[in-house]
């Protein structure tokens, strides 16, 4: 049984007459101990979908779903008190920018201990001991003195380590890492990812890794979901997707990598931008940017269908040579 089972999740912003679908009917599962990568450009709905799972979408956002099952609990119908006990304990999240996620008015030790107090209680000494253990676990040197420093006294890399310590404080079963290395330099990025994956294996956590960095997700994830304009356009194992992308958008993302541009003077890029509220096309949402789009693509929205072990949302999925082929059904 899946640890997390998301069915037909949507997130709308704006008024009910003209809502904007930031997330549009996505469904996926995460198994116990699995590392799932969610990739896509900025504006694809990656972060918003995870904030919806965490219950962090405020007005004017509206969340709807057939179900949001964590273990045997539906997060959508869970009463507020029970949800507060579950979110942050069994399900935790690391946010993009540690410098804005930590409260500048409190020491890092206080903030970690506050999370422990909220979810686990215990004595003040036990909470402090656990905080010191966590700071040491995430590789912060001299935790006995760092426990009393404020966020502005730490570097970006150290602040992100504090965020990781706070997220894993209550030993979550599912950890969502939203662009955990975006604000960090390349060397620190590698250290943070190595730490996250080491902790994931040690604690047997499930990990959802949200990123636009395909090289990063290739090394870390077992399975990948590709999102575009709030929709899932492709899903499969990391090996399959990198070896043989089926969706034109996935192909375009991969072709933008330096590894795929050997012998070329310029990297390939996908022209245009992710559509917003007022420029969403009919039919396939990628059709204004897709080099393979047909008149049928411009009129009819494709469904997410199975091609072998893969799921692809395209009328003309790509073959082994990277050329479009009309979909003939399962």
Swiss-Prot record:
The gene is dppD. Disulfide bonds: none annotated. Part of the ABC transporter DppBCDF involved in dipeptide transport. Responsible for energy coupling to the transport system. Its main location: membrane. This is Dipeptide transport ATP-binding protein DppD. GO terms for cellular component: plasma membrane. Its EC number is 7.4.2.9. Residues 6-254 form the ABC transporter domain. It is found in: Cell inner membrane.
């Amino acid at each position: 049984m899946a640890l997390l089972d998301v069915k037909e999740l949507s997130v709308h912003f704006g008024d009910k007459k003209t809502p904007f679908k930031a997330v549009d009917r996505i469904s996926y599962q995460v198994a116990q101990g699995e590392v799932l990568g969610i990739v896509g450009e900025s504006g694809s709905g990656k972060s918003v979908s995870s904030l919806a799972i965490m219950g962090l979408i405020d007005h004017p956002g509206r969340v709807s779903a057939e179900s949001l099952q964590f273990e045997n609990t539906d997060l959508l119908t869970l009463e507020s008190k029970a949800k507060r006990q579950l979110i942050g304990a069994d399900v935790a999240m690391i946010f993009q920018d540690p410098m804005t996620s930590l409260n500048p008015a409190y020491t890092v030790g206080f903030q970690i201990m506050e999370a422990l107090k909220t979810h686990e209680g215990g004595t003040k000494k036990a909470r402090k001991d656990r905080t010191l253990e966590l700071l040491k676990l995430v590789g912060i040197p001299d935790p006995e003195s760092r426990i009393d420093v404020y966020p502005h006294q730490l570097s970006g890399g150290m602040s992100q380590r504090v965020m990781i310590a706070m997220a894993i404080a209550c030993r979550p079963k599912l950890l969502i890492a939203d662009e955990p290395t975006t604000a960090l330099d390349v060397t620190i990025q590698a250290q943070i990812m190595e730490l996250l994956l080491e902790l994931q294996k040690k604690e047997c956590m499930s990990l959802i890794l949200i990123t636009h960095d395909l090289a990063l997700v290739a090394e870390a994830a077992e399975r990948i979901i590709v999102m575009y304009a709030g929709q899932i356009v492709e899903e499969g194992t990391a090996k399959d997707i990198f070896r043989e992308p089926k969706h034109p958008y996935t192909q375009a993302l991969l072709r933008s990598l330096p590894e795929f541009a050997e012998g070329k003077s310029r990297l390939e890029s996908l022209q245009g931008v992710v559509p917003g509220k007022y420029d969403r096309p009919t039919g396939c949402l990628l059709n204004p940017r897709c080099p393979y789009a047909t008149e049928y693509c411009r009129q009819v929205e494709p469904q997410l269908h199975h091609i072998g072990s893969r799921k692809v949302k395209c009328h003309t999925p790509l073959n082994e040579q990277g050329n479009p082929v009309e979909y003939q059904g399962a």
